[in-house]
Curated annotation (Swiss-Prot):
Cystine bridges: none
Protein purpose: Binds 16S rRNA, required for the assembly of 30S particles and may also be responsible for determining the conformation of the 16S rRNA at the A site.
Stored PANTHER family: 30S RIBOSOMAL PROTEIN S14, SMALL RIBOSOMAL SUBUNIT PROTEIN US14M
Biased composition (Basic and acidic residues): 39-58
GO CC terms, sorted: cytoplasm; small ribosomal subunit
UniProt record, GO biological process: translation
Encoding gene, per UniProt annotation: rpsN2
Pfam families, A to Z: Ribosomal_S14
Region (Disordered): 38-61
Gene Ontology molecular function: rRNA binding; structural constituent of ribosome
Name listed for the protein in its UniProt record: Small ribosomal subunit protein uS14B
């Protein structure tokens, strides 16, 4: 489980990215790079660290499922992820 402060920071950052996305796009199309540099640093999408939706784990993140490899394995073994089953050959 990640620290609650890190999870809260990630949520705040996602909100900021969504808020500034149209402004950022308009400035990029206009070629106003000075205006872009005046936007908050955390408003840039590349600064966001993807985290597990259930417990906030930052590493081992699987984009397709939105969770960490550990949580994915637990839920897959329980059969809670549709279309996923343990490989056997």
């Amino acid at each position: 489980m990640a620290k609650k402060s890190k999870i809260a920071k990630a949520k705040k950052q996602q909100a900021m990215i969504a808020k500034y996305a149209p402004i950022r796009q308009a400035l990029k199309e206009a070629g106003d790079y000075e205006g872009l540099s005046k936007l908050p640093k955390d408003a840039h999408p590349s600064r966001l660290k993807l985290r597990d939706q259930t417990d906030g784990r930052p590493r081992g993140y699987m984009r397709k499922f939105g969770m960490s490899r550990i949580r994915f394995r637990e839920l897959a073994h329980q059969g809670l992820i549709p279309g996923v089953k343990k490989a056997s050959w």
